[in-house]
């Protein structure tokens, strides 16, 4: 299988530094393709790190902040490589307009596989552009994939959300055409059945600092209230104010080692159907999530653990009340070892290696 792989543009690739949901998607797709021995042309950056993963690396510069110049260079590289290779698939994660156009110019739209993880937010210019390009990919004959049933359900609501920034979106086309394929992509691959450990008193937060979509300030207020029984992790690119004592840029392996002994994981992203990477990893180890969620909303977390604790709010709930409600739920949370085992077993059944390979195989033969 010959694949052109065009990464998410936020950070250079490093399998030990997964900084968010989109980077986790990136990691999981690439891991599958490497595992089946695909011949991968990876259009990335000078500071990508692959370890022993075998790819043909085509860097377009050193990434500190993604620039328009890099986008043009990437577009030229797509067309150049397409001129000398035959590709079975082109893989993207929420590509730019220039990338989508270059894929079309190269005659590769029909083999374009795009993986989504960012919820629609009509007042965010960057997110509006991402979804506008997802519509364009569909128009061009490419295919886009969602991580969960909840995300696909939200997509049918997103197509009625507008703002002053969405005037270029073709809503008539979008409302008439669901953008995602019926098959969800796997969000994790478990090579070995996780050992379920008894819980300590530790409760962890492991999400970037974002007070709007992720409500991380609510999470870190709960961590503060826990004292020595709370631990917050953030990447330096999205670090919180100094008043929050968090651990910055810890290796992914270090976070996972502590997580498997945690009493619970905090998740304060209340209204998305996407996957918070640490949440699925926690549940796979039997560790429950304490989920902040808007009333009557679906959430990806509930697809993996239907017994997840829901802390329900609505969009008009004052922040002080949200903090109080969530912190109370965190401080009063209890669980059992039997529940941890049940939680982990359900995720293992769905995402063991054989099941995941079958899911990817289905996507990459469609």
Regions found by a protein language model. Name each.
Residues 260-274, 287:
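Acidic donor-binding loop of glycosyltransferase active sites
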């Amino acid at each position: 299988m010959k694949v052109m792989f065009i990464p998410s543009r936020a950070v250079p690739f490093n399998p030990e530094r997964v900084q968010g949901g989109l980077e986790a998607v990136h990691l999981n797709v690439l891991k599958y393709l490497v595992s089946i021995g695909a011949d991968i042309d990876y259009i990335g950056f000078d500071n990508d790190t692959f370890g022993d993963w075998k790819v043909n690396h085509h860097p377009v510069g050193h990434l500190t902040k993604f620039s328009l110049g890099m986008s043009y260079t990437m577009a030229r590289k797509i067309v150049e490589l397409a001129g000398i290779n035959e590709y079975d698939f082109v893989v993207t994660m929420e590509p730019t307009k220039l990338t989508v156009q270059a894929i079309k110019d190269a005659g590769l739209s029909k083999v374009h596989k795009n993986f989504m993880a960012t919820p629609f937010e009509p007042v965010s210019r960057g997110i509006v552009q991402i979804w506008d390009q997802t519509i364009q990919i569909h128009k061009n004959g490419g295919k886009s994939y969602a991580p969960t049933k909840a995300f696909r359900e939200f997509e049918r609501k997103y197509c009625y959300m507008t703002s002053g920034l969405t005037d270029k979106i073709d809503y008539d086309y979008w409302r008439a055409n669901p953008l995602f394929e019926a098959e969800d992509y796997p969000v994790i691959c478990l090579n070995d059945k996780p050992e379920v450990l008894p819980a300590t008193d530790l409760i962890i937060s492991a999400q970037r600092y974002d007070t709007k979509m992720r409500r991380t300030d609510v999470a870190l207020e709960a961590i503060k209230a826990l004292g020595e029984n709370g631990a917050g992790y953030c990447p330096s690119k999205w670090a919180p104010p100094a008043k929050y004592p968090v651990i910055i840029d810890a290796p992914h392996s270090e976070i996972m080692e502590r997580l498997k002994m945690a009493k619970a994981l905090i998740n304060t992203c209340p209204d998305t159907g996407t996957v918070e990477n640490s949440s699925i990893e926690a549940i796979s180890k039997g560790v429950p999530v304490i989920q902040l969620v808007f009333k009557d909303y679906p959430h990806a977390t509930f697809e993996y653990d239907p017994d997840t604790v829901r802390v329900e709010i609505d969009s008009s709930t004052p922040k002080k009340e949200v903090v109080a409600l969530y912190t109370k739920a965190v401080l009063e949370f209890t669980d059992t070892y039997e529940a941890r085992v049940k939680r982990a077993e359900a995720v293992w059944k769905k995402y063991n290696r054989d099941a995941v390979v079958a899911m990817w195989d289905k996507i990459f033969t469609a």
